[in-house]
Amino acid sequence: MGSGLNDTLSRNYNGLELWEIIVIVLSAIFVVVLAISLWLTFRRKTSRSSSNLIPVSRQIPPSVPEEIKEIRVDEVSSSNGGNGYPSISEKFGDKEPEKGIKAESENGDSSRSGSFNHLEKKDGSSVSSANPLTAPSPLSGLPEFSHLGWGHWFTLRDLQMATNQFSRDNIIGDGGYGVVYRGNLVNGTPVAVKKLLNNLGQADKDFRVEVEAIGHVRHKNLVRLLGYCMEGTQRMLVYEYVNNGNLEQWLRGDNQNHEYLTWEARVKILIGTAKALAYLHEAIEPKVVHRDIKSSNILIDDKFNSKISDFGLAKLLGADKSFITTRVMGTFGYVAPEYANSGLLNEKSDVYSFGVVLLEAITGRYPVDYARPPPEVHLVEWLKMMVQQRRSEEVVDPNLETKPSTSALKRTLLTALRCVDPMSEKRPRMSQVARMLESEEYPIAREDRRRRRSQNGTTRDSDPPRNSTDTDKSEYHDLKPEGG
């Protein structure tokens, strides 16, 4: 039997004996199995080492819609091509861009809002230069690895160091959304760190809303989002720090020196706020409806420039779009009636809220104050009543040392009353509001005057000459709110 097995194994197949073929096949199988084992082992080690190199904080950030682009406030209309968006000159008047950019240059802040330099010629004219002005970035000196295209990526440790371990002494604001801390980055830049509360995933939602609303926009009157932190369940937003309180504090004398704003400072702050809202509503796509415009959300820097903050309730809307919700958000006293009653939201909701802020700045009163007599509880209704009774001079904030001129008061009152018109379609756009506040004339369109004359059956030629008393009466008549 043994000799038979030997004979079988010794048989010749293509020049090789059978036992040689068996050894070769077994060796090949062994080599293949060994190679596969080594490859799998190497792959496991590689995946482990790579996972150890990436900390928890390096998660993939939430995606930001590509349609939200960085758009400068003073971009010329030629950049719009034929897309149908109004140019800046259409929105703010033919001379406004030059005036705005020159003023910004004088303040040393033009790099933050203008894409073109305006150079003065000897003959007084100006030309545009396509080279943008640049200023040092508040993020200069920080590691570049955390730049992901839509803000700076901070680690939890970065922000712990910046805020002294989120010390209570660093708290500058809190609410249902979370807590805001003052901090200093490693390069010395002061920041405001908004730490969102993570209630049932609400932090993720609030984080996404604010990033989508303001992450890629730039305007000198919008508080700038510098970056964010995503680490574990932590969601934080890092904003520029605005160091001079907010409009509400300055209207109530709640600032450090218990001082009140002058009339000129109030108008400057209101114009800046109006231009920022016009930018959000009319210059970017999708437009941004803030939904919580109020005096405490208008921050003030050391040069008394306004900066709109807190975009936690903001809503993105396409062109000519409205949004209907069953959950009305905002602050009582500032919410537009159509939004409060039916949930209909569009940019005219912000216009109404801005009108209430205007009335606050004029009167120094709260939008709703139950400590006052019943006719004076609601600011909007009380002011309409005072205007109808031709007692406009009596509504001015008594804390103003120097009262505004009669024409300035009338102009601002009329602008405010148009903003708080109960019919949203009659409210002006924010670009119109900015023009009204800057104009030296009453914001009564010539077409409106002509229409009123035609309805009364009179013409310009047939109008009798009026003395100053008649003029004053007519102007007070113009102040009467429509539908109020």
From Swiss-Prot:
Region (Disordered): 72-135, 425-484
Residues annotated as transmembrane: 21-41
Coiled-coil stretches: none
Domain Protein kinase: 166-445
Topological category with respect to the lipid bilayer: Single-pass membrane protein
Amino acid composition bias (Polar residues), ranges on this chain: 125-134
SMART domains, alphabetized: S_TKc
Keyword flag ATP-binding: yes
Biased composition (Basic and acidic residues): 91-105, 460-484
Alphabetized Pfam families for the sequence: Pkinase (PF00069)
Phosphoserine PTM positions: S296
An example Gene Ontology molecular-function term: protein serine/threonine kinase activity
Listed InterPro entries: Kinase-like_dom_sf, Prot_kinase_dom, Protein_kinase_ATP_BS, RLK_Ser/Thr-Kinase, Ser/Thr_kinase_AS
This protein's name: Probable receptor-like protein kinase At5g18500
Taxonomic source organism: Arabidopsis thaliana (Mouse-ear cress)
Upper classification of the organism: Eukaryota, Viridiplantae, Streptophyta, Embryophyta, Tracheophyta
